[in-house]
Amino acid sequence: MYVVYLRNPKGDGKAGYYVGMTGLSPEQRFENHKKGRKAARVVTRYGERLVPRLFAHLNPMPYAKAKDMEVALADSLRKRGYVVYGGH
């Protein structure tokens, strides 16, 4: 699991988050996003930094649980009023 802070992806004055899961370390995955490797365009363009306080306590976890947690974490952030990408 990892969460990336996005600098104003919609141009509406609100910042947002990207929620994802990976078999890599969150740092390696973020670096790949920024370099355009298997990347979500929104992270490549607007990703500023990882937000460990939102995911560090969840890692590591098995793949099946991570799939469910990715959706749950994204939904939780949306319910708190954040713009959220990913979390499928």
Residues covered by each model-derived region:
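GIY-YIG nuclease catalytic motif and its immediate N-terminal context
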Residues: 1-31, 61-74
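Generic structural motif recognizing short loop/turn segments at the entrances and edges of beta-strands
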Residues: 2, 13-15, 46-52, 80-81
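Conserved short loop/helix modules at catalytic or binding sites
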Residues: 23-67
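Short arginine-rich
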Residues: 35-45, 72-85
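Active-site or metal-binding loop neighborhoods of secreted/extracellular toxin and effector enzymes
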Residues: 88
